[in-house]
Amino acid sequence: RLDFLSLKYGISKYYLSHMFKEQYGTSVNNYIINMRITKAKHLLRFSDLSTTEIANRVGYEDVNYFIRSFKKVENITPGEYKKKW
């Protein structure tokens, strides 16, 4: 991601990361994770998709990594989140 953007705009990955964090207050990776988790939360609430299907739809190939990432952000597992809503 950063490689593509840095080549496209002719700036270093370091500078691009620095500017992104300055503008948005978070790293590119954290921003992407938060966007994925936000989309996953929507799918958990409004679809009947399985956790594996949701993980794949939001860009995770490994469902266990998705569950760990979700729990790190939301402090509950995707399954617990779905039951809550």
Give the label of every model feature segment:
Residues 1-4, 42:
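Acidic/proline-rich low-complexity IDRs
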